[in-house]
Amino acid sequence: MSSLPLQKSLYPLLRPLGAAYRVLMRARRRRYENGAACGTDVPCVSVGNIGWGGSGKTPVVQWLLQWAAVHGLHAVVLTRGYKASPPGLPYVVTPQSSAAHAGDEPLMLARSCPQATVVVDPVRSRSARWAQERLAPDFFVLDDGFQHVQVARDTDLVLLKKDDLHAEWGRVLPAGSWREGPEALSRAAAFCIKCGSGEFSGLVPDFENRLGSFGVPVFGFSLRPGALIPVCGAHEGAQLPAGAPYVLFSGVGDPAQVAVTVSSFLGYDPVRHHVFADHHGYTQADMDRMAGYGLPLVCTPKDAVKLTAPCGVPVWTLSLETNFHSVWNAQPPAGQAGEGFAQWWQCRWQRLAGLR
């Protein structure tokens, strides 16, 4: 999500407040860098962003968890669990948990990556210590961890939106969407930007101008549709009839991208796209209103985990896979020019594991 229209119109007035917030965030970080952060006994990887909005953090976390499962490693995700109301803290999310207890994204991760453990706790230094004692992790993943200072980390994967390289560059809250100033990007081990493979080359001048001085790779990724999976109102293995009209609904950070992805996968647009706020909790009234069209419904996996009310009509979700497709590096190390994300991460992991 980019700056709001009011922020843009009031930017000259809000800019001094943004500068003050930027200084405050720097001072806060220095305090923890001087020894107040909680260390961990195993490698810790943060996946976060510089600003607010849907930059694709959860798909990148999911990629790391799937990589860990393939390599026989136990990954533990430390997440605050936005809008979660767990019965106790720390709270271990299971595939059987409710979205109300776990939060939508933690529950989605727990269901899609059962070999990993997802722990919800807004105090992540507490959940890190608790998990080290009880869960035998091979490494931690800090979800939305770039500005989180309580837990020390070995690697920061920083996600950027295309707007971050243009109009949003350096606009710190409340003057823009950024949580810190551009100097914070020097902490990044790599940048990841969600874009189509055809868009990536057009962004290279921005990488050179904005990110080249940091000397780390920039990886492009997209969400590749997998299959339509019935959620309710249709038996397992059922298929949406080819060409059948449908209604799309989503409560995510980038609804426009959802519409593009679903329409491209099915080959035609929905009759209607109901857009809800990010992390929206679906009510019976919501489902009744959408079922009133008498058409099948399609949603994202993040929406699907929150469907507890009777649907009234068949509902499908479109499974998505994280696809790293491009890389740019101003100064690639010897032998690493054009190295893809999987290869880069494998080398990074070997170094991290060797230091412990």
From Swiss-Prot:
Transfers the gamma-phosphate of ATP to the 4'-position of a tetraacyldisaccharide 1-phosphate intermediate (termed DS-1-P) to form tetraacyldisaccharide 1,4'-bis-phosphate (lipid IVA). ATP binds at residues 51-58. It catalyses: a lipid A disaccharide + ATP = a lipid IVA + ADP + H(+). It comes from Oleidesulfovibrio alaskensis (strain ATCC BAA-1058 / DSM 17464 / G20). Pathway: Glycolipid biosynthesis; lipid IV(A) biosynthesis; lipid IV(A) from (3R)-3-hydroxytetradecanoyl-[acyl-carrier-protein] and UDP-N-acetyl-alpha-D-glucosamine: step 6/6. InterPro entries: LpxK (IPR003758), P-loop_NTPase (IPR027417). SUPFAM superfamilies: P-loop containing nucleoside triphosphate hydrolases. GO terms for cellular component: plasma membrane. Keywords: ATP-binding, Kinase, Lipid A biosynthesis, Lipid biosynthesis, Lipid metabolism, Nucleotide-binding, Transferase. One of its GO terms (molecular function) is tetraacyldisaccharide 4'-kinase activity. It comes from the Bacteria. HAMAP family: LpxK (MF_00409). One of its GO terms (biological process) is lipid A biosynthetic process. Belongs to the LpxK family. It is an enzyme of class 2 (transferase). The gene is lpxK. This is Tetraacyldisaccharide 4'-kinase. Its EC number is 2.7.1.130.
